[in-house]
C-alpha cells in the first residue's frame, strides 16, 4: 500500500486535501484523524506537521509527501521534488530595520533570527559571511525590537507585517517556495508504479488549474501568426470549416495569459474566441 504524507494544518493543508480529492482519493471527514485508508486506490494517507513531512519521506517510512519547498530544504532530509503544485507560494528573504540601505554583506558579525536556520546558514556560507543565527519558532519580526537580533530571515508576502515592525526586506530571495510533492532521493522500484500513478493524477489536477482550452475561428491567411500565439503543448488542433478561407483552431493556453492571448488573436482577425475550463489532463 502506498503511504503518503499530507499537511495536517496550516495554509498548505486545505489546498493539498482538495487536490488529492480532485485526483480521486478519499478525503478525511474529521480533522482529528491522523490517518485515512483509501482501499479503492490502495493508499494510506498520514496527516502530519508540514515541517516534519520531509523527514518522514526522507527516512523511507513514507513514499510521498506534500510540503513546502522551503520546509523540505530546511529539513535537510534526502528528498527530491516530483511535482510543483502551484499553491502556497512565498519568498524567503532577509529583513532589517528601515532607514538605511541594506545588503547581505552587512549581516557580517550580526545576529539573525529565523525559523529556518539551516537555510540561512547555507546562504551565509555560500556568501562567505560569518554571523550568529538564532532559531525562533514564530513571531520572528518582533525579535529585532526586543533586542534579540539585529536582522531576521523570514517568509515575506506583501511586506505589510515587516512594515508594522519597521523592517524592510533586502537582497535576493533565499528560497522561492511553493507546495511540492516529494519522494525520497534515490527511491527504488518499490511502489514505483503507485508513486507514478498518484503523481500523474495530481499533475492532471494541477494542470487543469493552470491551463484553459481555447477555441477560435481563424482566417487561413493569418493561421501561421495565430499558431505562434497559441502553439499548444505539442501542436494546436486545426480543422477545416465550411468556408474554405477559415479554419477552427483549438489549443491549451496558460490561464494567467488568456486575456492577452485573446486580445492578440482578435487583433489579427480571429473570431468566436472561446475559453473553457478543463478539470483534468494526462500527458
From Swiss-Prot:
Disulfide bonds: none annotated. Catalyzes the condensation of ATP and 5-phosphoribose 1-diphosphate to form N'-(5'-phosphoribosyl)-ATP (PR-ATP). Has a crucial role in the pathway because the rate of histidine biosynthesis seems to be controlled primarily by regulation of HisG enzymatic activity. This is ATP phosphoribosyltransferase. Belongs to the ATP phosphoribosyltransferase family. Long subfamily. It comes from Mycobacterium sp. (strain JLS). The keyword Glycosyltransferase applies. NCBIfam families: hisG (TIGR00070), HisG_C-term (TIGR03455). Feedback inhibited by histidine. Its EC number is 2.4.2.17. It is found in: Cytoplasm. GO terms for cellular component: cytoplasm. Coiled coil: none annotated.
Amino acid at each position: 500500500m502506498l503511504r503518503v504524507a499530507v499537511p495536517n494544518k496550516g495554509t498548505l493543508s486545505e489546498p493539498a486535501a482538495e487536490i488529492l480529492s480532485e485526483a480521486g482519493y478519499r478525503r478525511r471527514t474529521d480533522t482529528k484523524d491522523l490517518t485515512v485508508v483509501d482501499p479503492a486506490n490502495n493508499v494510506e494517507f498520514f496527516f502530519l506537521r508540514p515541517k516534519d513531512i520531509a523527514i518522514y519521506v526522507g527516512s523511507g517510512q513514507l513514499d510521498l509527501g506534500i510540503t513546502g519547498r522551503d520546509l523540505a530544504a530546511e529539513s535537510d532530509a534526502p528528498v527530491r521534488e516530483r511535482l510543483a503544485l502551484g499553491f502556497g507560494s512565498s519568498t524567503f528573504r532577509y529583513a532589517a530595520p528601515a532607514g538605511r540601505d541594506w545588503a547581505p554583506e552587512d549581516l557580517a558579525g550580526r545576529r539573525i533570527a529565523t525559523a529556518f536556520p539551516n537555510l540561512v546558514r547555507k546562504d551565509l556560507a555560500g556568501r562567505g559571511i560569518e554571523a550568529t543565527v538564532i532559531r525562533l519558532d514564530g513571531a520572528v519580526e518582533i525579535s529585532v525590537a526586543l533586542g534579540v537580533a539585529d536582522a531576521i530571515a523570514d517568509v515575506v508576502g506583501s511586506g505589510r507585517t515587516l512594515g508594522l515592525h519597521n523592517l524592510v526586506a533586502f537582497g535576493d530571495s533565499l528560497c522561492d517556495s511553493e507546495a511540492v510533492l516529494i519522494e525520497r532521493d534515490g527511491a527504488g522500484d518499490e511502489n514505483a508504479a503507485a508513486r507514478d500513478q498518484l503523481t500523474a493524477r495530481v499533475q492532471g489536477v494541477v494542470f487543469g488549474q493552470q491551463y484553459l482550452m481555447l477555441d477560435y475561428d481563424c482566417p487561413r491567411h493569418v493561421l501561421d501568426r495565430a499558431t505562434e500565439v497559441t502553439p499548444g503543448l505539442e501542436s494546436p488542433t486545426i480543422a477545416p470549416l465550411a468556408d474554405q478561407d477559415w479554419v477552427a483552431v483549438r489549443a491549451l493556453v496558460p490561464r494567467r495569459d488568456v486575456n492577452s492571448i485573446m486580445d492578440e488573436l482578435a487583433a489579427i482577425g480571429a473570431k468566436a474566441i472561446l475559453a473553457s475550463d478543463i478539470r483534468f489532463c494526462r500527458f
